């Protein structure tokens, strides 16, 4: 099996780590039939790829076999943001497979994170909708669903192009990432309405970039900080600033 090296996967602070643990738990409550999960947003740069990568890591740490499929064929950020490199001579990805240039086994990469696999885009394309709606998409999604416990699909922003809605046809559930103080209720409602037209079940939203200082009382905030620092001691020592992908 081909391999990918994830060079940058930053440590999370206590609050962020607990948030992803809660997200993973809530997904499990949605039922055993929810195996393929589409992650999208209304706008670009709301943190959907950041959410995908950390959900991948969290679920993998829970001994789930997880694969992340990068379906943002026009403007993928995962490879560059997380310093992901191919190991070996072949650099095939989703775009190559959908175009008939390689086979399914050529694009599923094992990573250096235990229990985590990835399907990269391979190359950016302009005709992304044409590729995603090809007859090769359904067999790929069915195979991934059969071989993995969870399939995470990093889709483009649903409010900008229709690729996310196309991919939703092949997914059991969807998460909408919303950046705090950026998304309007009307815009988010439009995304939910578009996804709901498919058979994909909208599981909920993920609120990202929240500044808890802006609405948490001073006394409660300090108590929360002391509680968090107790558990952070000894394992959280980030060396780089956190990069949030698209």
Q: Model-predicted segments: where are they?
A:
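P-loop NTP-binding module
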Residues: 1-246
């Amino acid at each position: 099996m081909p391999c990918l090296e994830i060079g940058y996967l930053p440590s999370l602070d206590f609050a962020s780590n607990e948030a992803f643990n809660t997200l993973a738990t809530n997904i499990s409550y949605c039922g055993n039939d929810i195996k393929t999960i589409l992650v999208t947003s209304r706008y670009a740069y709301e943190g959907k790829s950041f959410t995908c990568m950390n959900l991948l890591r969290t679920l993998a740490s829970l001994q789930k076999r997880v694969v992340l499929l990068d379906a943002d064929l026009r403007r993928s950020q995962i490879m560059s943001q997380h310093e992901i490199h191919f190991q070996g001579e072949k650099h095939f990805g989703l775009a190559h497979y959908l175009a008939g240039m390689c086979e399914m086994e050529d694009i599923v990469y094992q990573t250096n994170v235990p229990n985590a696999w990835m399907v990269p885009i391979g190359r950016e394309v302009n005709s992304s909708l044409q590729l995603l709606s090809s007859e090769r998409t359904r067999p790929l999604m069915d195979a991934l669903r059969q071989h993995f416990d969870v399939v995470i699909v990093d889709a483009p922003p649903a409010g900008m192009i229709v690729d996310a809605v196309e991919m939703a046809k092949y997914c059991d559930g969807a998460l909408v990432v919303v950046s705090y103080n950026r998304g309007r209720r009307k815009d988010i409602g439009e995304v939910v309405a578009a996804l709901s037209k498919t058979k994909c079940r909208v599981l909920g939203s993920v609120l990202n970039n929240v500044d808890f200082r802006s609405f948490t009382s001073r006394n409660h905030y300090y108590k929360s900080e002391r509680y968090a620092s107790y558990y952070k001691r000894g394992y959280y020592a980030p060396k780089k600033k956190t990069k949030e992908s698209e």
